[in-house]
Every structure is written in C-alpha cells, then in structure tokens.
C-alpha cells in the first residue's frame, strides 16, 4: 500500500478532494513490466478499464502530483513507456 504525504488545510472541501484524489491514484497503481523497466514494478495505469500505462497519461500524472506523492511509482511509469535502441531512448506507443 502506498503511503501518500499527509495534507490538510482549513478547507474541508480541499481536504476531501485531496483524499479522493489520492484514493483514485492508489487504485490505479498496478504491477507492470514493459519499456526499459528491468522487472515488474508498480506503475500508474491510464485509469479504470486499462491494464497499462499510457505515455501521455504517465507524463501528466507525474507532472500533476505523482512525482511528489509517489515519485518511485511515477518514475517506473515513465520508464515503462520508453524504449532504447542504439541511438538512445525514445517514446514508444501513443503520444
């Protein structure tokens, strides 16, 4: 289970929104191996009904808060949508 950073304000609606967002994020973390990941690791999938991360979603999730709330999972997500060849790394799949 992911332990998210604790966040509380004097605004009950903001506190509730944060808790709901973290719960949604946590529900979308699954084990996965693809791209340049060397073994199966937790990643953020594209959402309910998906079984894999998507390139655009991985970037947006990392930018929006994943990089702060779950940095290792966010890094795994980004690595899972990269490929490597003799010229270096490149984005695979959808953009």
Spans of features found by a protein language model:
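Helix-terminus loop motifs that line ligand-binding clefts
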Residues: 36, 69-95
């Amino acid at each position: 289970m992911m332990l998210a950073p604790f966040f509380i304000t004097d605004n009950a609606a903001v506190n509730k929104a944060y808790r709901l967002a973290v719960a949604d994020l946590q529900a979308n973390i699954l084990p996965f191996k693809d791209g340049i990941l060397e073994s199966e690791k937790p990643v953020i999938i594209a959402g309910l009904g998906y079984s894999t991360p998507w390139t655009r979603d991985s970037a947006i999730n990392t930018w929006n808060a994943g990089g702060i709330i779950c940095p290792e999972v966010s890094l795994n997500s980004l690595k899972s949508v990269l490929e490597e060849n003799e010229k270096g790394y490149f984005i695979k799949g959808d953009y």
